[in-house]
UniProtKB/Swiss-Prot annotation:
Pathway this chain belongs to: Carbohydrate degradation; pentose phosphate pathway; D-ribulose 5-phosphate from D-glucose 6-phosphate (oxidative stage): step 2/3
Transmembrane segments: none
Record-level Gene Ontology MF annotations: 6-phosphogluconolactonase activity
Organism: Saccharomyces cerevisiae (strain ATCC 204508 / S288c)
Similarity comment text for this entry: Belongs to the glucosamine/galactosamine-6-phosphate isomerase family. 6-phosphogluconolactonase subfamily.
Protein name: 6-phosphogluconolactonase 4
Role description: Involved in the pentose phosphate pathway via hydrolysis of 6-phosphogluconolactone to 6-phosphogluconate.
């Protein structure tokens, strides 16, 4: 059964989210200076949440062992890094760059694994190579994967609908080229559920009233046509959901 944490105050949600990540870091590193913390993150609003919970929280920030972090992206849009739609580009702008102003030099910061930008725009063969190369970089398993959930129930770039079965049903390959995203840009790469299933811990962060209907479908109805529900079914007790009261408005208090 998945774990559900709900918060009425944004400040409390963000702080507890940061504490959760910190706990997973400590579990992975166990005081070993040579150990690494393998974490994968989603794009979108996750970047701002990571800034608020890890960089801007003065109680959390001093305990983050950035040089031991190995950061990957659960999905990435096949656009240049300076494009506003680039997950890495937005992560750099929102999280990495502010680390300089916190006294951390970037060469002492986390190691971030990006797609091969030089292959972007090279067509089908190049797009498949981008996915294959990124898959080759991944660790055997992640200590933590941070996910979002779209209003349609998608997570990573795994979307509901039969036209996306080639992505959702893949359990052999770790990373695939998504060539028909319903949201621009249509070309992306995405983790498959095979990667998520092997993670030591998975966490969804969902905020806002726009998500209340899909949260009901995911957590109460448990519609197995939704990729986010498939994560719950596959990973079970390793999944934690962080919701604000707006997103959880249709979830019973005792759930």
């Amino acid at each position: 059964m998945v774990k559900l944490q709900r918060f009425s105050e944004k400040k409390s949600l963000i702080h507890e989210f940061g504490k959760f990540i910190l706990e997973k870091q400590e579990s992975a590193l166990t005081g070993d200076a040579d150990a690494v913390f393998n974490i994968a993150i989603s794009g979108g609003s996750m970047n701002q949440a990571l800034y608020e919970s890890l960089v801007n929280d003065k109680n959390i920030f001093p305990h983050i062992k950035w040089p031991q972090w190995r950061i990957f992206f659960c999905d990435e849009r096949l656009v240049p890094f300076e494009d506003p739609q680039s997950n890495y580009g937005q992560f750099k702008k929102t999280v990495l760059d502010p680390l300089v102003h916190q006294g951390n030099q970037l060469n002492l910061g986390p190691t971030v694994y990006t797609i091969n930008e030089s292959l972007i725009g090279g067509g089908e063969t190049a797009n498949r190579k981008i996915a294959e190369e990124y898959a080759s970089m991944l660790p055997a398993s992640f200590d933590l994967i941070l996910l979002g959930c779209g209003e349609d129930g998608h997570t990573c770039s795994l979307f509901p609908g039969v036209e996306f079965n080639y992505l959702v049903e893949e359990m052999d390959r770790k990373v695939l080229w998504c060539n028909n995203s319903p949201k621009a840009p249509k070309d992306r790469i995405t983790f498959t559920l095979a990667v998520v299933a092997e993670a030591k811990s998975v966490c969804f962060l969902v905020r806002g009233a726009a998500k209340k209907a899909i949260m009901h479908d995911v957590l109460i109805v448990k519609n197995s046509e939704l990729p986010s529900v498939l994560v719950n079914e596959m990973v079970g007790t390793k999944v934690t959901w962080f919701l604000d009261d707006e997103a959880g408005a249709l979830i019973p208090e005792n759930c």
